[in-house]
Amino acid sequence: MPKANPQVLKALTKAYEMELETAVNYLAQSINLDGVRAEEIKKAMAADIQAEIGHAQLIGNRIKQLGGTVPGSLTLHFNQKLLQPSPDPTDVVAVIKGVIASETEAIKTYNTIIKLSDGRDYVTQDICIKTLADEEGHLSLFNGFLKEYEKK
């Protein structure tokens, strides 16, 4: 097993927090959204909750394997302002844009970890490459939703 790189552990911890926060926000949004136009978005978000939790489990296990400590709820740092429930539960576009912002940030984080672990920690890199592919899939799906919603 490679010696734990503090930068990699810090970035993995950020990714772990982001995955959990995304799952929490997807859960809230999949319940709070209202309206006929919201149904497909709610279904997509509800389906992605388990994927995001699965990502957090993979990342958390890797943090532990590298000698780090997986954070508990009191030390998590959440900051997805754009994914917070809207006062208007029919504002589907705001939710879609929040998902896009969240997935874009996750993609940046995984790309950072992939670069930090390149040539040093192939297991971490492999986990992040696979997770990156999932996040890119989520981003593509919600970009497609946004295109449809922004048509006039």
Give, region by region, the residue ranges found by the protein language model.
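Iron-associated oxidoreductase/ferritin-like identity signal
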Residues: M1-K152
